[in-house]
Regions:
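Catalytic or ion-translocation cores adjacent to nucleophile or general acid/base/metal-coordination motifs
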Residues: 15
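C-terminal lobe substrate-recognition/regulatory segment of protein kinase catalytic domains
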Residues: 46-88
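Phosphate-binding active sites in nucleotide-utilizing proteins
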Residues: 143
Length: 313
């Protein structure tokens, strides 16, 4: 709640086949490996103890792309004992290496000139994050996060990543989050969640949640957490869409301020939030500060927080 915009970065998580500690580090080897004019990408693991770069795929998978492997390695034992350089002898000269140094989903806190990476709670690391949206779901004046989770489109030799049901994270205003499980939040989506967006669909002053699924119906959750917030709709030159990029911030009766909220239509994966912003009302909101994309700044007094506040230039 310091007025600086932070970043939220979803990742593969720490519970996939790519998980690693200090013993085996995941790499991606990419280039024209087979010499056939096509660009290839192979997953590899660097074994720290033996200082060897090893293939991650089984031979039955790789030989479909590189038939010569069966001739060079008649048995699986021979293949398992070989390094990646030995398997593709003389064919990795033009290839490049990329190291997967961090698989955790994190929040990047803006410290003014630098970002501090802070991992999200462990429940956010159990499965990949495909989408995220930010709102003050419990109206306590601190921004919260919803994460769309799960990924099923994996190879036969890998396991399906389905440990998530959609995760609500309640923020503390200092960059920390607490996981709220489905039996408490009511959010239980067991499919492949993709896009997610928020909007006040029943005009009760609370941000509701819409979640899309791959090969499944979308899920709508009406919010009953906390008290109602302040509804704000921005218009620039008479258009709500032209207000995109404006920054809103609540000013409370005691002079303190809430978090900065960016009026951005985009949300998560191919999703769009409502143009009406819901500002959490932990304390009585006295006014709303707006920094418009044009550089103009304005302050609007809040007379009745129960009414929709429409602001424009």
């Amino acid at each position: 709640n310091d007025g600086r915009f932070d970043l939220l970065a979803g990742n593969r998580g720490l519970n996939s086949h790519l998980k690693h500690g200090n013993k085996r580090l995941p790499y991606l080897v990419h280039g024209d490996i087979g010499g056939d004019g096509f660009y290839d990408a192979l997953e590899a693991r660097f074994d720290v103890a033996s200082q060897r770069l090893l293939p991650r795929h089984q031979m039955v998978t790789l030989e479909l792309l590189f038939p010569f492997l069966r001739e060079n390695f008649p048995t699986h034992r021979q293949y398992a004992a070989a390094t990646l350089q030995q398997i593709f002898a003389g064919q990795l000269a033009g290839a490049k290496l990329l190291k997967a140094s961090d698989l955790a989903s994190v929040v990047l806190l803006n410290r003014g000139g630098r970002f501090e990476a802070r991992p999200l709670p462990v429940e956010a690391q159990l499965t990949p994050v495909n989408g995220a949206t930010v709102a003050d779901f419990d109206s306590d004046g601190n921004e919260d996060v919803f994460l769309s989770q799960n990924f099923f489109a994996v190879r036969v030799e890998d396991y399906r990543m389905d440990a998530g049901e959609g995760l609500l994270l309640l923020g503390d205003g200092q960059g920390g989050f607490v996981s709220v499980f489905g039996h408490r939040s009511g959010i239980k989506v067991f499919g492949e969640q993709r896009g997610c967006a928020v909007g006040d669909l029943n005009d009760d002053g609370r941000p509701d949640l819409l979640i899309a699924q791959n090969k499944g119906l979308p899920k709508l959750y009406l919010n009953v957490l906390g008290q109602a917030g302040l509804r704000v709709r921005l218009k620039f030159n008479g258009s709500a869409a032209a207000g995109q990029g404006a920054v809103l911030r609540s000013v409370y009766n005691d002079g303190s301020k809430g978090p900065a909220r960016l009026g951005s239509g985009s949300s998560g994966r191919y999703s769009r939030n409502s143009d009406t912003q819901i500002l959490g009302a932990a304390k009585r909101i006295r006014s709303v500060e707006v920094s418009w994309p044009s550089g103009i700044k304005s302050v609007e007094q809040v007379i009745n927080p129960a009414l929709l506040l429409e602001l424009g230039l």
